[in-house]
Amino acid sequence: MTQQGRGVVLLAASSASAVEWVRRGVVPCHVLEHSAWSIVVPATRASVTAAPYDDALTLLASRHVGPRLTPAIGLFAMDDTAVVTARAGRSPARWALRAADREIVRGPRLPALTPEDLHRTLAGNPGAREVPIREVRALWGRTDLTHLEWLVEVVTVLGLPGGRALDGSDGALGPVISPDESAVRAFESVVKDVHQ
């Protein structure tokens, strides 16, 4: 995780399901319950695995979310990039990257997340607030905010929880949920095979 990095993953699932998802991963996290979402917040800057798989935010941003936990929305500030990910049902995760110049750009080999995609993802959670599409589109044009301010604005406009966890003002994040050792061993076995 970077010096200024922050991130949250919102899952349309119970907190028990979110805790299980964290335990099957490699990043220690806090899990906060909300009426419509479970909020997953990395508890550390690093995962429990060795480099190059040690950046908690990168791993959370790219982590697969199964259809039982979707829709899922991830919001991350990493170095000079803001990242929004969204996944609904069995569709692939889609990505919006906000570059250093504060413009939304396509990621190489990443399915692009459009305002319409994000709007559909949000609508997939019956507990989510209905947001006019024009408000979602307007977010893509906001270049007056820093990356973290922009991500908090996305959360605010979409009526999502987690803004205080994202900006660092919520200090009561609850216990740290640690990954299961078997999940860590399985991950390390897979990446070991990739690098041999």
Language model: regions and residue ranges:
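Hydrophobic alpha-helical segments that drive targeting, anchoring, or assembly
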Residues: T2-W140
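Long, compositionally biased intrinsically disordered terminal regions
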Residues: A100-Q196
